[in-house]
Swiss-Prot record:
Signal listed as a keyword: yes
Protein name in the entry: Beta-toxin KAaH2
Organism of origin: Androctonus australis (Sahara scorpion)
GO molecular function, a single term: toxin activity
Keyword Cell wall biogenesis/degradation: no
Amino acid sequence: MMKLMLFSIIVILFSLIGSIHGADVPGNYPLDSSDDTYLCAPLGENPSCIQICRKHGVKYGYCYAFQCWCEYLEDKNVKI
């Protein structure tokens, strides 16, 4: 019983540490000249999304929810 309690406490502590130091990377969905997002497939790392994100001035992006997502894309650079 004591081992289970200790294990539970350790799991909770690691969960809290992970949520405090989470790796949420800011970003935005880039927009084309018609204010539409760029559609994409397959999900995940996607060469066309990376290319689109580079046009918007950031180094990396990927396909998320069938739309290109650019990491570190600021609001002012969303539309080209």
